[in-house]
């Protein structure tokens, strides 16, 4: 089964069998199928369910679950679990941890606390992905794979010792000599001149928190390069084992990452995590904000710039919050339908709701899913079924192209440069937001187009109007 095949629209949800007693599995899957959910995503935070102790692999848990899924006709997207390394790993190998700008390591207990450039983490990632893919990939329930989870989410800067070593290598390959680097970075200013690459570090705290903008732009390129290589490391392994027709994806879009490059190198298509009610969180209620959840049309247009047709791996289905912060209120009746159709209108052929059951423990205890804590049927589940019925009538739009005559030109270097320049950032963002809001107010379809080496004049010919505000590079 392919979920992006141009033939029909497909509904899914995110499920965590490790959170629930096995006696609930069959009933959960049965209720999903009865309400139009055909696909589930699993295992993105479950490293210890496969490798509880270093080098000791146990496949029984997910073997049992996948067999139940296959027996009931539920299809599965299986994830690599590298977003949350287990405690034994970070305790034994602290060099895998990411650090803040002052070099203080982020410790076990959260997620995404590793760094891409640790040779040890790359080694252990290779092992867990190889073991998982070689064992599970041929299972009939599995139709695709998700790499990691939300690459560059929460933290898209890396300051560990491994990152400094990798950054030096990145710069040596780019410039060839330290003199060329000094010239490009303008290091004569404030006597920043380097005599060797060993004197260069990832950006660190300085007296006035000032930065060399040329260094930081190269550093941002390096972060993107590191994330792309980490995704490709995993994709190359999975490709050796997957069944014909199965796919590889990951869920984005996050900062300091060239999503087009990552998709072209490692994925069959990209997916996105869509939480439109973030627009209403906290003090946003008091703001005169015309766009509100229509702001997510801008985000979805960015996704469409990466993949013409894409998937939504996490579509908001409930109130959102961690124990440390409030994020978004419960969708009103009909809002799940609105947001789902918003995603479909922008090119999503697959929409997966986050999550099936609301977790009863952990940081995301207030991040509600389709079902509340009781697990009983509710109005949101009824709305999912209603969406499925609508999908049945909309199959002819699967694989169709979003038609726009207005294009907004972007490129990563200018986007990254603007975020490190307080003068340029405000002007660029205000222009971008103003153009998007004008398009929304006039119901004018608009595309984002990223200028890359493979973009030609022919690619721009369909547009009657092109905006390219404030490029400085």
Model-predicted regions and their roles:
Residues 1-24, 29-38, 285:
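An acidic-aromatic substrate-binding cleft motif
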Residues 7-9, 36-38, 70-76, 138-143, ...:
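Short, well-ordered coil/turn segments that N-cap beta-strands
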Residues 10-22, 43-62, 107-126, 150-156, ...:
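The substrate-binding groove and active-site-proximal loops of carbohydrate-active enzymes
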Residues 13, 32, 40, 69, ...:
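Conserved, mostly hydrophobic/aromatic
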Residues 19-34, 125-131, 252-263, 332-341, ...:
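Short, acidic/polar
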Residues 26-106, 129-133, 234-242, 472:
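Aromatic-lined substrate-binding rim segments of carbohydrate-active enzymes
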Residues 102-269, 273-298:
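Polysaccharide-binding and catalytic clefts of secreted carbohydrate-active enzymes
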Residues 197-200, 244, 275-278, 284-473:
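Carbohydrate-binding surfaces of carbohydrate-active enzymes
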């Amino acid at each position: 089964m392919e979920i992006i095949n141009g033939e029909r629209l497909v509904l899914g949800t995110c499920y965590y069998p490790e959170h629930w007693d096995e006696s609930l599995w069959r009933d959960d899957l049965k209720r999903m199928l009865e309400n139009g959910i055909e696909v589930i995503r699993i295992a993105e935070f479950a490293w210890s369910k496969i490798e509880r102790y270093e080098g000791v692999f146990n496949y029984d848990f997910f073997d049992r679950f996948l067999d139940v899924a296959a027996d009931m006709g539920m299809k599965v997207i299986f994830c690599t679990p590298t977003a949350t390394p287990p405690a034994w790993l970070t305790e034994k190998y602290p060099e895998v941890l990411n650090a803040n700008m002052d070099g203080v390591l982020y410790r076990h207990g959260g997620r995404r606390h590793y760094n891409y450039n640790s040779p040890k983490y790359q080694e252990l990632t290779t092992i867990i992905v190889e073991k998982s893919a070689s064992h599970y990939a041929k299972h009939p329930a599995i139709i695709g794979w998700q790499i990691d989870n939300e690459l560059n989410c929460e933290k898209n800067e890396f300051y560990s010792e491994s990152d400094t070593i990798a950054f030096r290598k990145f710069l040596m390959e780019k410039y060839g000599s330290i003199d060329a680097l000094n010239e490009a970075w303008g290091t004569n200013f404030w006597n920043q001149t380097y005599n060797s690459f060993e004197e260069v570090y990832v950006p660190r705290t300085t007296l006035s928190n000032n930065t060399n903008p040329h260094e930081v732009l190269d550093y941002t390129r390096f972060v993107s390069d590191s994330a792309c290589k980490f995704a490709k490391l995993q994709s190359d392994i999975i490709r050796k084992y997957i069944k014909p027709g199965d796919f590889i994806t990951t869920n984005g879009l996050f900062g300091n990452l060239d999503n087009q490059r990552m998709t072209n190198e490692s994925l069959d298509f990209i997916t996105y995590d869509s939480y439109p009610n973030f627009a209403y969180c906290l003090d946003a209620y008091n703001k005169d904000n015309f766009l509100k959840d229509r702001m997510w049309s801008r985000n979805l247009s960015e996704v469409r710039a990466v993949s013409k047709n894409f998937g939504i791996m996490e579509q908001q289905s409930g109130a959102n919050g961690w124990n440390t912060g409030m994020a978004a209120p419960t969708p009103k009746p009909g809002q799940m339908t609105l947001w789902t159709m918003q995603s479909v209108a922008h090119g999503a052929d697959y929409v997966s709701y986050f999550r099936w059951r609301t977790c009863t423990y952990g940081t995301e205890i207030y991040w509600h899913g389709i079902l509340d804590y009781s697990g009983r049927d509710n109005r949101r589940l009824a709305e999912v079924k209603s969406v499925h019925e609508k999908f049945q009538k909309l199959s002819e739009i699967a694989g169709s192209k979003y038609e726009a005559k207005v294009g907004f030109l972007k490129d990563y270097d200018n986007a990254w440069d603007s975020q490190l320049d307080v003068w340029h950032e405000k002007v660029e963002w205000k222009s971008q937001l103003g153009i998007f809001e004008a398009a929304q107010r006039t119901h004018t379809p608009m595309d984002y187009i990223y200028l890359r080496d493979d973009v030609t004049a022919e690619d721009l010919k369909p547009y009657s109007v092109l905006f390219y505000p404030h490029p400085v590079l």
